[in-house]
Design a protein with these regions (language model features):
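P-loop NTP-binding catalytic core
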Residues: 140, 148-209, 615, 620-622
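Glycine-rich phosphate-binding loop of nucleotide-binding enzymes
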Residues: 184-280, 550, 598, 621
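P-loop NTPase motor domains
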Residues: 230, 245, 249, 255, ...
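Hydrophobic residues in beta-strands of the RecA-like P-loop NTPase core, especially within AAA+ ATPase
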Residues: 241, 502, 541-542
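Phosphate-binding and hydrolysis-coupling loops of NTP-dependent motor/remodeling domains
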Residues: 2-22, 36, 40-48, 57, ...
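Conserved ATP-driven motor cores of ASCE-family P-loop NTPases powering translocation/secretion/packaging/pilus
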Residues: 129, 520-610
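Conserved beta-strand position immediately N-terminal to the Walker
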Residues: 210-211, 453, 539
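Conserved ASCE P-loop ATPase motor domains encompassing nucleic-acid-directed helicases/translocases
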Residues: 28-177
Length: 622
């Protein structure tokens, strides 16, 4: 029984009256209406093209913007279009199909009235139940136009008004967004069944470098530890510069009850990271001495470029001149004594002519060698009586050659030499350079598949020493990865991917530092450029992104943005990161811990993501 027949039945049952007291429609009127309906082809039926649509596009207004359309929908469909939903818009008249993303809304608007009209304000304030009917509205950004072969190209036109709009289901949404991969970040906000991942077996993301930014407490450590755990599982070599020692216990499962509950809700396991190794500088302590594999290491003076070394020390022009005079005299003395290159060794003879001091120091030169040369020159320039004190046996055994070489240095200004030697001696007293009680870093072992090396820098007060450690290890990693890459190519294999995480990157590469340390920055930039082709990726982690210079931001192609409250920082990042819509930028200051805006090269558009809880133990986390 249809609605008209039902109405007739009710009227007959009530003695010719409707229940609401309104008299019946005259029979001849109803008959005329029915005849008109039949003449028009029967009752209205929605066109098949509109079946299943959640809404339709609205006409444009003077306030419409390029690239976006307004979609209206009945109130029962509002819940079907959460934020970040992907939709398909079928422009019927011109037979075009578009893909779009919900960037604003959904909003509830009254039918036929302004939401701020006096009558609605009065009804709402007084709690009267006679609320008007309402509908939903969303703003959709056009992502692309779908061609007949399934390809998506940049849109050349706009969908026409009254075009039906369909919500993509989760599998199709994930396919359009490109969320597939073997390293999981979390789930898309509003789409708990869509996992947001990155492909570690492609050069699209990690070898093109990542920035993880956010204020304290935003969830950066959770993101970093979770990524390290997953990269280890798929055989990536990971090196993590840990400035606080908080990652030195990731070999154990998390003991945080809230993390355990969050992991259970996501269906994830509580587990530690396998194959972890903790390195700390000789003479320093680690935050986790109970770790099963703790190793001390030394710095080798010859591994550092003298140009990077003098920048890190912050030498003045006068001190810099004298530093290079001492280095040059020391090189000649090492050659004369056959320390390097060794006499009769043709390969070392050739290598000595090709040493690039912008990349590395002079082989086998130690800080102690430089102190002997510099001390003797200062002794002579200052007019000190007696013979200068010499510490190296090789120099003592040929004192005549040593004296002749240091006297060939034409120089003056004892004060500059004295300040320079004071700085070098302070470094020497730390006993971190060329210390025979500790081993050099074994980069070949460090870059084995699935190995996680945590360089604990927490027990270092000196930023200069910390930066020397990072600079030397970065350079060693680059050289080893170059060798691994060449060997893999010759064998027809893919090299082991390597990821290097640099915590508190603003201390290593701040705007002020790269202005005073251009050589050091150029080394990092060279690693970034070469690393893209050699499966070597850098991850810059910082809570103070305002201190990162534009030159560093320009090296990064993938971003995880946690809560950032400073509007000036957000404005600056907007100039460096493209494709993020306004609503995501405006949400950054209000993100909850664990939420992040993710802009990765494999994603078709940036997404708000609920980052997965960390399965492993972090120290110093409240």
């Amino acid at each position: 029984m249809d609605s008209r027949d039902q109405e007739k039945h009710e009227i007959e049952r009530n003695g010719g009256q409707r229940e609401d007291g309104v008299g019946p429609i005259p029979a001849d009127v109803m008959r005329a209406v029915e005849e008109d309906i039949e003449a028009a082809g029967g009752e209205y039926e929605e066109a098949p093209e509109y079946e299943g649509a959640i809404g339709r596009t609205m006409f444009d207004t003077p306030y419409s913007e390029d690239g976006t359309v307004t979609v209206l929908m009945p109130k029962e469909n509002i819940e079907d279009v959460p934020r970040q939903s992907l939709v398909r818009i079928k422009s019927i008249e011109d037979e075009r199909s578009y893909l779009g993303a919900v960037v604003k809304g959904p909003f509830a608007e009254p039918d036929g009235l302004r939401a701020d009209s006096p009558i609605l304000v009065s009804v709402t304030v007084r709690g009267i139940v006679l609320q008007p009917k309402h509908h939903g509205r969303v703003q959709v950004e056009i992502v692309g136009e779908e061609l007949n072969d399934g390809a998506v190209v940049p849109p050349r036109r706009r969908p026409l008004p009254n075009s039906p709009v369909f919500v993509l289901d989760s599998p199709e949404t994930a396919d359009v967004l490109g969320t597939g991969g073997n390293v999981r970040l979390g789930v898309a906000d509003g789409h708990e069944d869509i996992e947001v991942c990155a492909p570690a077996d492609s050069k699209v993301v990690f070898p093109r470098h990542v920035g993880i930014l956010g204020t304290t407490g935003g969830g950066k450590s959770t993101t970093v530890s979770g990524q390290v755990a997953q990269l280890q599982k798929i055989g990536t070599a990971v090196v993590l510069f840990d400035t606080e020692g908080e990652y030195t216990a990731i070999n154990k499962p998390t003991d945080d009850e809230q993390m355990k509950l969050a992991l259970k809700r996501r269906g994830l396991e509580v587990e530690g990271v396998d194959d972890t190794h903790v390195y700390h500088l000789v003479g320093r302590e680690t935050a986790n001495p109970s770790h099963p594999d703790v190793r001390s290491f030394r710095l080798d003076f010859y591994e550092l470029s003298p140009y990077a070394f003098k920048e890190i020390l912050g030498l003045t022009d006068a001190q810099e001149t004298r530093f290079f005079q001492a280095c040059e005299a020391c090189k000649l003395l090492l050659r004369d004594l056959g320390i390097y290159p060794r006499r009769g060794n043709q390969q070392e003879q050739r290598e000595a002519l090709e040493v690039d001091e912008l990349e590395t120091g002079y082989p086998r030169m130690t800080l102690s060698h430089l102190l002997d040369i510099g001390g003797a020159i200062l002794h002579r320039v200052a007019g000190t009586e007696g013979d200068p004190r010499i510490f190296n046996d090789a120099f003592k055994n040929d004192r005549e050659l040593f004296d002749r070489r240091q006297k060939l240095v034409k120089t003056d200004s004892a004060p500059s030499w004295r300040v320079l030697m004071g700085k070098l001696w302070r470094l020497h007293r730390l006993n971190i350079f060329d210390n025979r009680g500790a081993e050099s870093v074994d980069y070949e072992a460090m870059l084995q598949p699935g190995r996680v090396t945590i360089v604990d820098l927490g027990d270092m007060e000196s930023t200069e020493v910390r930066n020397m450690v990072i600079a030397q290890i970065l350079k060693g990693i680059q050289r080893q990865q170059d060798r691994n890459y060449q060997e893999a190519r010759q064998a027809g294999n893919r090299p082991t991917p390597t990821m290097v995480f640099i915590e508190e990157a603003h201390e290593f590469l701040s705007s002020q530092r790269i202005r005073s340390m251009p050589v050091l920055f150029e080394q990092v930039a060279r690693i970034a450029r070469r690393g893209r082709k050699r499966w070597l990726g850098l991850v810059f982690v910082t809570q103070l992104p305002q201190h990162l210079p534009d030159e560093v931001l320009g090296l990064i192609n993938n971003w995880v943005l946690h809560k950032i409250g400073d509007s000036n920082v957000v404005s600056r990042l907007r100039r460096s990161i493209g494709g993020v819509d306004d609503i995501l930028w405006s949400s950054l200051p209000n993100l909850a811990p664990g939420q992040a805006v993710v802009s990765f090269s494999n994603l078709s558009r940036p997404l708000m993501v609920a980052i997965d809880p960390t399965p492993c133990k972090l120290l110093m986390v409240e």
